[in-house]
Amino acid sequence: ALVWADSFSQTLDGTGARAVVDVLEANGFAPIVAPDACCGLTWITTGQLTGAKKHLASLLSILAPFAASGIPIVGVEPSCTAVLRDDLLDLLPDDPRSLLVSSATRTLAEVLSALPASERHLPSLEGVEIVAQPHCHHYSVMGWDTDQALLESLGARVTRLEGCCGLAGNFGMEAGHYDLSVAVASHSLLPTLDAQPDAVYLADGFSCRTQAAQLAGRGGVHLATLLAGYSG
């Protein structure tokens, strides 16, 4: 398996990417970490599509050979994983490598769930309470049902938040957006964290972890971090 450590995972919080490698190794894979490469997410979210296409074209030259060899590409940051699964096909539709890479891209939960249950080497989460904040891109593009089913198969009790955390990448950091960002977080995320102070806060998205840390003083963990047995 190829672990695609996106720009967020390489520069802002590498815990999730390292844990993805550990979990894959424990489950019989020989993970390779992809060379440095950006998918252009920040260009996409700010409407700079010409720049985004250049970054994606460069990324394809790195990832396509692995995909062509049948090696799954495992994403770490949900928003970047969603770029490969969805935006890539819209931005570079005439490049045959786009469909190849998009089809090979998986979430960690998808890779693990494809293994027979008897071959999964994962910790018991019996009795563990989890408040899960699916990243909006994860929820809308890849879906989060596979993640929830995997967690529940390990014994976890999962409270799944349906709304946005409110940070939404750079949105909540931009001038004039702070109050709205906090209001969105106050709709679901913050009251649920307050009601379940002992629960593990599970959030694959860097934005979702940042929002909870800054507004509630609550640390969050990536799915891989939880499965690797880390405390976060």
Where are these regions (language model features)?
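Iron-sulfur cluster-binding electron-transfer modules in prokaryotic oxidoreductases
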Residues: 1-232
